């Protein structure tokens, strides 16, 4: 006897899915596509294997490259600063020395007035020293500036080594100090002395007619003794009163500016020393990398 074949499934009755069958496999495939199939708390994939000596060598090369670029940038910054100082010194010195020479030549001395000997000596000495200081600063600027200009116009980073600004640093600072500090103080003193020389002979009082003949000596002495301060003396005293506070303000500002500049340079030096210390530490680690062998990727721990 042959067994009876099984009846075909009816279309009216839906086929039930097997327990844990295709539904489970489909959910697994969907989780695998979305990336959520991994259990929570799984460690991330390990980084690429980089040995500690290789990492130190890479850091060393980066620091060396940055150090070289920073040194070139520092040299170019010093070159541009030196050029700016020389240009400012040359312009200031030419202007102030020319004014002092014109003032000394164009001043009209009254032959009938008895000038104090100290006033004339101070005016002559101040004018001479003022012109000498500014001409010295102008000479330094004229001699050094063309060499710096020739290097700064070359579009090459290594051409900064051909500039004499590093070797002539003291001369550049001296010219800048003579032109902007000492020369300006002497110019303020020159203005005060020029006011005294120019206005001191004026003795005519307001509302009085100009005398047609020279009065006798006794009358002139009596007039001077009874009149008090003349208009010329008042003008000279007024100019001195105005100029002295400005001179003190100029000195205070110069000292404050110098202290601020020195403080800024000191901070920059400390920063460069810290960078050099970091560079020395990396160099020491690179030199002794064979003394402490480490496994790959251990520096990431």
Curated annotation (Swiss-Prot):
Has UniProt tagged this entry with the keyword Transport? yes
* Recorded GO CC terms: basolateral plasma membrane; calcium channel complex; membrane; membrane raft; plasma membrane; plasma membrane raft
Residues in the Cytoplasmic compartment per record: 1-87, 141-173, 256-301
Instruction: Identify the stretch(es) annotated as Interaction with STIM1.
Output: 70-90, 272-292
List, as start-end ranges, the regions of compositional bias called Low complexity: 18-27
Q: Looking at the record, which segments are called Required for generation of inwardly rectifying CRAC currents?
A: 3-47
The entry's protein name is Calcium release-activated calcium channel protein 1
* Native source organism of the sequence: Homo sapiens (Human)
Question: What lineage is this protein's organism placed in?
Answer: Eukaryota, Metazoa, Chordata, Craniata, Vertebrata
